[in-house]
């Protein structure tokens, strides 16, 4: 949600920011028109309430003196009716303003590159050299099917398209990755692990910016609960509608969950393999912090995600996303892209974002300053995947494949896999 005071003072800057996010309509003008009408109605209501209070006092005095007061009573009734009518109009304008603001993305941070799509993203750094194969590397789905450990046909028969069955050692590899990642986040980086439901109320989805704009992208149950598209939804809402103390911050959560997405806008993209699925596992990081520390927290969070890839010895690059490629709630985002030799390209495996106060305004979460307890500021929220389990499995399969179709197991994972060193038939 946006700060209406900022829009009042900086309409041109807000308009420019929205255009950089791909919003072409004249948003600031529309917002200020609605805001003006709402404030005008609020002023009228305040004036009418003042008049009614004065008349009420006058009626009391007249009754005490046993003087006639019928005229004043009728006037009070008339004002009450007018207040009720204007209150309905004021609420309608408030709802209209919230609806417009709720559908607009966050304002990009000043150092975010301006651009329409991924072609304007900036590479920040790279890690690791690409492996030189003495054979033509295969894709993960070719490897998985030949090993008999990845079944797309049965998944499609039972569940439909964009689902995958992992068996045997590949299923075990997924479990090993979950355990490795969570232990690292908790033991090395001080995150608090959370196990949570996969279903949430619409309010929780609204608070993080998933609703109303992306309603069609999530799965809705018959009793109005939604399957989470990411643990970010639940973890961020753990602090919804609270006033915290600055000394409590930062708070850092981590969780593994199954995630569910319709992928409504992905028709024809990544139809083979398990790059883009309706259901996938992911380990998520969420940080709750202050305005002054949120930029540093984003750097820390990104480095945590990178550390996993370093321990897995997978080559990757870090990209600073441009304004048009960031997620709806983000003001600054790093994507980490892992090298996939089977595709001969880098693909996203993690996305770490600073959402600033955008989500906090929606869920009404603030903190009191240590120097001034009366001063309340909105918290800043951050989220990042560390990492997507399916895509990490893909990266291991393609980077650690052998000429005979077997897959070496990264050293850091072997203790989670009964000390196995290779995945084979």
From Swiss-Prot:
Assembly: Homodimer. The tRNA molecule binds across the dimer.
Gene: serS
This protein's domain notes: Consists of two distinct domains, a catalytic core and a N-terminal extension that is involved in tRNA binding.
InterPro entries in alphabetical order: aa-tRNA-synt_IIb, aa-tRNA-synth_II, aa-tRNA-synth_II/BPL/LPL, Ser-tRNA-ligase_type_1, Ser-tRNA-synth_1_N, SerRS_1_N_sf, SerRS_core, tRNA-bd_arm
Organism: Wolbachia pipientis wMel
Family to which this protein belongs: Belongs to the class-II aminoacyl-tRNA synthetase family. Type-1 seryl-tRNA synthetase subfamily.
Reaction catalysis annotation: tRNA(Ser) + L-serine + ATP = L-seryl-tRNA(Ser) + AMP + diphosphate + H(+); tRNA(Sec) + L-serine + ATP = L-seryl-tRNA(Sec) + AMP + diphosphate + H(+)
Residues binding ATP: 261-263, 348-351
Physiological role: Catalyzes the attachment of serine to tRNA(Ser). Is also able to aminoacylate tRNA(Sec) with serine, to form the misacylated tRNA L-seryl-tRNA(Sec), which will be further converted into selenocysteinyl-tRNA(Sec).
Record pathway: Aminoacyl-tRNA biosynthesis; selenocysteinyl-tRNA(Sec) biosynthesis; L-seryl-tRNA(Sec) from L-serine and tRNA(Sec): step 1/1
EC number annotated for this UniProt entry: 6.1.1.11
Protein name, entry field: Serine--tRNA ligase
Record Pfam families: Seryl_tRNA_N, tRNA-synt_2b
Top EC class, one word: ligase
UniProt keyword annotations, A-Z: Aminoacyl-tRNA synthetase, ATP-binding, Cytoplasm, Ligase, Nucleotide-binding, Protein biosynthesis
Compartments, as annotated in UniProt: Cytoplasm
Signal peptide residue numbers: none
One Gene Ontology molecular-function label: ATP binding
Residues involved in L-serine binding: 230-232, 284, 385
GO biological process: selenocysteine biosynthetic process; seryl-tRNA aminoacylation
GO CC annotation, single: cytoplasm
